[in-house]
Amino acid sequence: MLRDLFVKKKKYAAIPSEQVRKDVPDGVMTKCPKCKKIMYTKEVLKNLKVCVNCGYHHPMNAWERLDSILDEGSFREYDKEMVSLNPLEFPNYEEKLESDRKKTELNEAVVTGEGTIDDMLVVVAVMDSRFRMGSMGSVVGEKIARAVEKAYDLQVPFIIFTASGGARMQEGILSLMQMAKTSVALKKHSNAGGLFISVMTHPTTGGVSASFASIGDYNLAEPGALIGFAGRRVIEQTVREKLPEDFQTAEFLLEHGQLDAVVHRDDMRESLRKILEVHQGGEMAVWQS
């Protein structure tokens, strides 16, 4: 008995039963990946998917983004039925596309169309990273190019929200061609006096960051967005140097002159409205000359 006093007792942890776990339905709570605070999902959604504790910007899907910037009921979608095929017969590509269509209820990684911001007509494209990580394949490039051409025809500004892992590897050179195609369409729009606003969200990388995302008349970004071409580890191994902690963040790019502004999501619609308002007179004068 005396010996038992000196024996280290085992510590046990209570493991929640399945019944306890089921008391909180899926989707009710959201954990912030930055500050780790657990919040009611409805509270996060009400705050435009921005953490109420630390300001972290959670990813938005395409429809949430459109709802946050456009006048209610003003959006009209373009090219909704366009879908990707498998021209290079890449293994399992069709199955992955179909899986993403079911998961996201989208046909591709970008939604394009027209709508109004404070009654000012714009053509808008919004990339959705849930679909193949927002990668740019031939259909994504085609939809963006067509949207730019529509903005040119309507003589209205073009706005894009980017969120992409870059070119889509399953489409090879056909994917890389979209970098040139979209850039040429934007050049035509620009030469005619058209306004182009690019808003980079997390993440904007690879061929998307190296093409249309970076050539706006105004280049904006959301706080903390990862923006860059190659990955951090690849660059460090190439230059054999340790990169700054904030390298490839929106704030780093702003400090080094690659962005015009970092705009909080709460202020995005108003910032776009002000830019559009400033360019209304000048832009129309160019179109009509």
Swiss-Prot record:
Pathway noted in the entry: Lipid metabolism; malonyl-CoA biosynthesis; malonyl-CoA from acetyl-CoA: step 1/1
CoA carboxyltransferase N-terminal domain span: 28-289
Keyword terms of this UniProt record: ATP-binding, Cytoplasm, Fatty acid biosynthesis, Fatty acid metabolism, Lipid biosynthesis, Lipid metabolism, Metal-binding, Nucleotide-binding, Transferase, Zinc, Zinc-finger
Zinc fingers, C4-type class: 32-54
Any single Pfam family the record assigns to this protein: Carboxyl_trans
Catalysed reactions, semicolon-separated: N(6)-carboxybiotinyl-L-lysyl-[protein] + acetyl-CoA = N(6)-biotinyl-L-lysyl-[protein] + malonyl-CoA
Extent of the signal sequence: none
Molecular function GO labels: acetyl-CoA carboxylase activity; ATP binding; carboxyl- or carbamoyltransferase activity; zinc ion binding
Lineage: superkingdom: Bacteria
GO cellular component: acetyl-CoA carboxylase complex
Cofactor dependence: Zn(2+)
Compartment(s) where it occurs, according to its Swiss-Prot or TrEMBL record: Cytoplasm
Note describing how the cofactor binds: Binds 1 zinc ion per subunit.
GO term, biological process aspect, one: malonyl-CoA biosynthetic process
Its EC number(s): 2.1.3.15
PROSITE patterns reported for this sequence: COA_CT_NTER
Binding site for Zn(2+): C32, C35, C51, C54
Family under the similarity heading: Belongs to the AccD/PCCB family.
NCBIfam families assigned to the protein according to its UniProt record, in alphabetical order: accD
Function: Component of the acetyl coenzyme A carboxylase (ACC) complex. Biotin carboxylase (BC) catalyzes the carboxylation of biotin on its carrier protein (BCCP) and then the CO(2) group is transferred by the transcarboxylase to acetyl-CoA to form malonyl-CoA.
Oligomeric form and interacting partners: Acetyl-CoA carboxylase is a heterohexamer composed of biotin carboxyl carrier protein (AccB), biotin carboxylase (AccC) and two subunits each of ACCase subunit alpha (AccA) and ACCase subunit beta (AccD).
Protein name, entry field: Acetyl-coenzyme A carboxylase carboxyl transferase subunit beta
Organism: Bacillus thuringiensis (strain Al Hakam)
Organism placement in taxonomy: Bacteria, Bacillati, Bacillota, Bacilli, Bacillales
